Amino acid sequence: MLAWQVIGLLSCAACSSTSTEPAGGGDEFAVARARLVDGLRAQGITDPRVLNAMALVPREEFVRSEDRPQAYRDQALPIAGGQTISQPYIVALMTQVLELHGNERVLEVGTGSGLQAAVLSVLVREVYSIEIDPQLAAAAEHRLRALGYRNVRVRAGDGYYGWPEAAPFDAVIVTAAAAKIPQPLIAQLKPGGRLVMPLAKDDGQTLIRADKQEDGLRIVPVTAVAFVPMTGAVETPTP
């Protein structure tokens, strides 16, 4: 019940209506993509700009070739390096919770296959995406460029430290779970900015949104989730 209440609270009422007709005409993937978007709408994804982005991004290009027939099932799928591409509903939900309007600069931690970056690319001015696995980062950068997402920059590195030379950011999205929000990411978030990420506790993971205010962070829980753990410096205990 909490998830639906919070989704309603954080839905983007200010977003303008746009078409959700997917690119690609009548091919089978376009039909499946449109059906997926209808399902997302039924699950509480109400921001028309997010629905439009989900309708435009070809998820089949971001999964393994053997998984292309399952590309538009609402489920996570494996990718290289023991990682996963997130469930479409979670991609849409995290994007909606950020309340993006179009002129933002967004930092993504955990590029993976590049799907979330592609969705953000449709919605914002600039996307900076960091991936700790160099092979995944290189593959995602090549894939995004080949598909025409020109406002996305990808680099290999430890997302714990963010991308300081490109900061500050209007929004930060973290696609791996950690016990607490990395301090460098908070520092690189603009005042009034939003961060969304899964936080891990002993009893499971909770997707949260953190708003950076003058007196600190306002954290709102969204829903229970299951993400791969964040790796790198975040694993080192703080003295």
For the regions a language model picked out, list residue spans one by one.
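N-terminal auxiliary segments of SAM/dcSAM-dependent transferases
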Residues: 15-66
